[in-house]
Amino acid sequence: MKTKIWIALIALYIVWGSTYLAIRFAVETIPPFLQAGLRFLISGLILVLWRRAAGDAMPTRPQWKSLAIIGTLLLLGGNGLVSFAEQRIASGVAALIVGTVPLWLVLIEALRPGGVKPTWRAIIGLIIGFGGIYLLVGPSELTGKLQFDAIGTFAVIAASFLWSIGSIYSRSAELPKSAWMMTGGEMVSGSLLIFMVSLILGEWKSFNPADVSSTSWLALLYLITFGSMIGFVAYIWLLQNAPISLVATYAYVNPLVAVLLGNWLAQEALTSRILIAAGIIIGSVIFINSARQASAGREAKPVVPDKEEIASSG
């Protein structure tokens, strides 16, 4: 069993760590929101039809409403904005910024009415983590300008914020009991909203399938099969068979995998500043999650990672 667990965990690291690079290749010749819509519509329909055939109940009308809200926040606001941003900034940088979702979760929980107030350890982790973001994308010492494209940078920051809002909302929303059906319904409803944005932005008018490169088509296929389906299957299996603390390591490893793959396969810059910022950001996430584990331990409750916190799914 240990061998299977490690195989699944390494597969999860590689698959979800590589989705950011796959998005970059996909949006080279496919409009970003159209790409995201196609990815989630196909993946979602496969999951819904599969689980319905397996006997899972279809979502009720109130559940579809909740799934549509989550799809708007996570898939349109989260993945859609990341896809848009990766036309402007490196995939590894996008992954590092999205890796701060646990920081936003703590901050939003602290500020919302009735939310959970952070411990001092969590507050220290927040300060360190957001300091890492500033180091990553802040002004250059030489030019005084931002390290990366401002629009792309702020789009990913907004995506991280919306991911966090969607995650917190999902904890109290009425959702299907089946994690598979929930994910499929979220993808289907989210994809329809993404297509609407794509239509409004005029992506369909300028899109010609003949102009899409083979690299972009293969990247989209990879995102559908591996990023949205195989990766999630591995994740659910790990939750059922491996220690939660081990499964949660995806939040630390995936951004690092994304940075290294981007440098290796797309020749993205890998400067000392990026490496130091990566260490600070990932370290702060570990620090905050350890604080959550300690707090949960005092309350005799395990900290279970939410599916909606999977930033690395891209």
Give the location of each predicted region:
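C-terminal-most transmembrane helix of multi-pass membrane proteins
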Residues: A36, F40, S216-L218, Y252-G314
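Alpha-helical transmembrane segments of compact multi-pass small-molecule transporters, enriched
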Residues: I42-I46, I97-L111, S189-L193, L218, ...
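Membrane-interface helix-cap regions at the ends of transmembrane helices
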Residues: S18, A22-F25, T29, S43-P59, ...
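Specific transmembrane alpha-helical segments of multi-pass solute transporters/efflux pumps
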Residues: V15, T19-Y20, V48-V98, I108, ...
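C-terminal transmembrane-helix exit sites in multi-pass transporters
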Residues: I46-M58, P102-I127, L256-L275
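Hydrophobic transmembrane alpha-helices of multi-pass small-molecule transport proteins
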Residues: L47, A68, T100, P118-S140, ...
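Hydrophobic alpha-helical transmembrane segments of multi-pass integral membrane proteins
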Residues: I7-A8, L34-L49, I69, A122-L135, ...
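Hydrophobic/aromatic residues within transmembrane alpha-helices
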Residues: A26, Q35, R39, A85, ...
